[in-house]
Regions:
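Noncatalytic, beta-rich nucleic-acid-contacting surfaces in large DNA/RNA-processing enzymes
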Residues: 1-273
Length: 276
């Protein structure tokens, strides 16, 4: 369901950014910074950088990705530092998009061989992200990517522990074919009517399907082994917790863990809060 493998990665897992990754094909860290900057700007990617890349005019490394790059690029071209800074500030605040370049700016850029596509790209931008923020976001994403690649079971266990409220138990234990069938059903419902609940369920199913397709398995709920709300790695697989059952609340799931895993006496339904 994805060409990027970035499901579950902050800043990189949304439909919008996954589409950017497919279009731009970043190959190194600096190009991923470009993706981070482009995804947080306004009118920086859509109808701007995406068209430049698609037409072959320039690459992901060359488009305007972060606000800082405008000033640095213009300085390399030989513009006066004050003018380079002022142009950057005007572009990143959307002032150029709204009212055009100040007198003399465009002429100076052309005199210093700034290409037409770059000047026109500046005209479209309404907001630009600072490079420092883009790097900070990307560093967090890279750390999680590393775990997803080299410690996948741990990654999925932690992901679902933190964001597993909408997990589909039947899909998790049923295998990739069941997960895909459930995904298709949710997508069908979303085409008919958008709603936040189904969108969250779809994200969860995408992670479930990805994990299964990669060859990793979920273990079903088992008394004495499952936790209340924590997914745990067991023999290279991910053990589902009690809370993965629909309708079983957190308090009841924790009570079941205490009763079955920690040796507490399992007396009656009331002690597990299952009848609350």
């Amino acid at each position: 369901d994805s060409q990027t493998g970035t499901f579950g990665i902050p800043e990189m897992g949304t439909n919008f950014v996954r589409g950017m990754l497919v279009e731009a094909r970043p190959k190194n860290f600096s190009e991923l910074i470009q993706i981070s900057g482009l995804s947080h700007g306004t009118d920086v990617w859509t109808g701007n950088a995406d068209e430049l890349i698609r037409s072959g005019t320039c690459t992901i490394a060359e488009v305007i990705g972060c606000r800082d790059s405008i000033m640095l690029y213009l300085l390399r071209k030989g513009l006066e530092p004050k003018m380079a800074f002022d142009i950057m500030e005007a572009v990143r605040k959307g002032k150029v998009a709204k009212g055009g370049f100040a007198p003399g700016w465009e002429e100076a850029m052309r005199e210093h061989d700034v290409p037409d596509w770059y000047i026109e790209s500046c005209r479209k931008i309404k907001y630009m992200f600072p490079k420092a923020h883009a790097v900070a976001y990307l560093m967090s994403a890279i750390r999680l990517m590393w775990f997803k690649l080299y410690h996948p079971q741990a990654f999925y266990a932690v992901y679902f522990t933190v964001r597993g409220d909408d997990i589909d138990y039947e899909a998790a234990v049923g295998g990739a074919a069941v997960a895909r069938a459930h995904m298709n059903e949710v997508k069908r419902r979303l085409k008919e009517e958008k709603n936040a609940k189904d969108e969250d369920v779809l994200v969860s199913l995408q992670l479930v399907n990805e994990m299964l397709v990669r060859g990793y398995e979920f273990l079903p709920i088992e008394l004495g082994k499952s936790r209340g709300s924590k997914y745990v790695v067991e023999d290279g697989k991910v053990r589902l917790p009690f809370c993965s059952l629909k309708g079983l609340g957190g308090a009841a799931a924790d009570a079941l863990e205490n009763a079955t895993l920690h040796g507490q006496e399992y007396q009656d339904r009331k002690s597990t809060r299952l009848n609350s």
